[in-house]
Amino acid sequence: MKKIKIGICGWGTVATALHRSILENKNQIKRTHQVDLEIVAIGARRDNPKYSAGKTKVLRNIFDVLDEDIDVLVELIGGTDDAKTLISSSFEKKIPVVTANKAVIYEYGDILFREASNNGVDFLFEASVCAGTPTINLLKNDLAGNKFLSIKGMLNGTSNFIISQMEDGMSFEDSLSFAQENGYAEADPTFDIEGIDAAHKISILSNIVFGSPLPPNEFLIEGISNITKQDIYIAEKLDFTVKHVSSADMKDGKLLIRSNPALVQKSDYLSSLKNVRNGLVIDTDLIGKIHISGSGAGGEATAAGVISDIVRLASESSNHNATSKEDLKYRQISDELFSFLIIVNSSSENINSDVLDMLAEHNISIRNSGLILSLIHI
């Protein structure tokens, strides 16, 4: 049986859930995976009033964890610069790293992948996208041999939770407050509601699937803060749902990445995912479309992804390190043709005939949703 000694840096929601999960599931992991997990030390600048480390050694200087007898460092401090320095220091000491920190991968991914490779250690980050839902390993290993055509999905549980509440009649502001009260949104929700968190995640997936650099070239990032109850109502009338969708697809040898609100037909798989569910549709040449979904928020779900990476270190095929393509070409969002919706506070009888003729010439159909006229480009 292989023993793995763990050092954890960070002592927030995910770190405490990880500590608890390892202690509670230690015997099961031994039995099913033949791996003995031992938490040697925790790097925490302050105590967590909601959870005690018990008998585990706590070090106030997080970098001191690297001086302990550990086989893997779990980086859960969040942020970018300090996290990058910590991870790089771990690589220099030939200690592999597991992280759930999508921000540091987005900002420094290419540098960290190179450092891990140069030092001959693993850098695993399953929990950085879709928490504990198996995503990174699926793309890196299980789908080897497939050519990826596109990947799209809902990658932020907070945004999906808020939109789900709005579908039930709540305003955006009330939905956000409700999400915060239930622990699904941070006190400062900017990263979630402005699409930044989802943009980080689709960038990581695009790096794995298409080799795009980290950080990536500039692409469309838009959040949900401007969505109104009226938007939700109109979408419902037109047999759509509003979702925050992030995607990366290759067409004619050029890549397009985007992360923005979109109308999704009710018959679409993504439309069925509610509350904090994350979901992905992966399109490949050999086996077609693959649908996956799971909880995208919460300490326990994220801890599950971290544990899967730690256990994977005991195997021979644990490396998640990715490589960017230097000659990758991009498509611009301004060059793309999309269906779109324009809402006009009027009835068709009140619109000038010249306007109607112009719309017809450009294949823009007019549908009346009942109270508000909507225009859909098809």
Model-derived segments and their meaning:
Residues 1-92:
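N-terminal glycine-/serine-/threonine-rich beta1-alpha1-beta2 phosphate-ribose binding loop
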Residues 78, 91-107:
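ADP-ribose/adenylate-binding Rossmann-like module
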Residues 84, 102-126:
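Rossmann-fold NAD(P)-binding glycine/threonine-rich loop
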Residues 117-120, 124-197, 204:
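Rossmann-like NAD(P)H-binding beta-loop-alpha module
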Residues 165, 176-272, 277-279:
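Substrate-binding/catalytic subdomain of NAD(P)-dependent oxidoreductase enzymes
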Residues 289-336:
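C-terminal, non-catalytic macromolecule-binding modules
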Residues 333-346:
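Short glycine-/aliphatic-rich beta-strand segments at the starts of folded cytosolic domains
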Residues 376-378:
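Conserved small/polar residues in nucleotide/adenosyl-binding loops
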